[in-house]
Design a protein with these regions (language model features):
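Hydrophobic packing residues within well-ordered alpha-helices of enzyme cores
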Residues: 24, 46, 72, 98-99, ...
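ATP/NTP phosphate-donor binding region
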Residues: 1-63, 185
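Active-site glycine-centered loops adjacent to acidic/histidine catalytic or metal-binding residues
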Residues: 9, 66, 91
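Internal helical hairpin/lid segments
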Residues: 195-208
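Short amphipathic alpha-helical segments
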Residues: 18-20, 73-76, 100-102, 207-208
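Catalytic core of DAGKc-family lipid kinases
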Residues: 31, 40, 79-196
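Short Gly/Thr/Asp-enriched flexible loops that form oxyanion-binding sites at enzyme active sites
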Residues: 68-81
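Short, glycine/serine-rich, charged loops/turns that create anion-binding
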Residues: 11-12, 94, 200-201
Length: 208
């Protein structure tokens, strides 16, 4: 029997997982997993628990939004390479952009069924200053929308909450002076937005 640490963010997205949480856990147990559940207590809790408890488990699965997944990844990446566990993802956030890129269903039960049959595979992980990301790293206009949007708005409106918060950010548009080196070329200019994405959609908008 394999040991699973199941990290659950109860405040993610529209909190739809609570209606199927027991069914999701039942799927894991019936597929030979001994499940330990950790309910996140604050924004950084997923990162902390992933780092501190990895040695006790064979796999970590997180249920939440793209932010919850990012926190788990940041916790895992602080460990020596040999100690980093496979990470599974049950998407239940407001947009689930990264899950869409990996063709993971945004219905908890369907995602769990797919997860227990899946084989681990490698994904690209970005590194910016002291943070790691699998979804997106951005600066400038709209880049703080996901963090600035109140959680209660996301729970009620889902993707629409980001749209409303984005409209507010248009009022003040700062620019950033950058020197960019790529493909043996150098570009220098002022930019109002920049993004590195590991997803086919950002903020709920597809085909970026």
């Amino acid at each position: 029997m394999k040991k699973m640490l199941f990290v659950v963010n109860p405040k993610a997205g529209k909190t739809t997982l609570k209606n199927s949480l027991a069914d999701v856990i039942d799927i894991f147990i019936k597929n030979d997993y001994e499940v330990t559940i950790h309910i996140t207590q604050n924004a950084d809790d997923a990162s902390r628990i992933a780092k501190e408890r990895s040695m006790d488990f064979d796999v970590i699965v997180c249920a939440g939004g793209d932010g919850t997944l990012a926190n788990v990844i940041n916790g895992i990446m602080q460990l020596p390479k040999a100690d980093r566990l496979p990470v599974g993802y049950i998407p239940c956030g407001s947009t689930n952009d990264y899950a869409r890129s990996l063709d993971i269903p945004d219905v908890g039960i369907k995602a769990a069924r797919k997860l227990v049959k899946a084989q681990p595979f490698a994904v690209d992980i970005g590194h910016l200053t002291d943070k790691f990301f699998v979804y997106v790293a951005a600066f400038g206009i709209f880049s703080d929308v996901s963090y600035a949007t109140p959680q209660n708005m996301k729970n009620v409106l889902g993707h629409g909450a980001y749209v409303l918060q984005g409209i507010k950010s248009v009022i003040n548009i700062p620019s950033y002076h950058l020197v960019i080196e790529h493909d043996n070329e150098v570009e220098e200019d002022d930019f109002i937005y920049g993004m590195v994405s590991n997803s086919v959609s950002v903020g709920g908008y597809k085909s970026m």
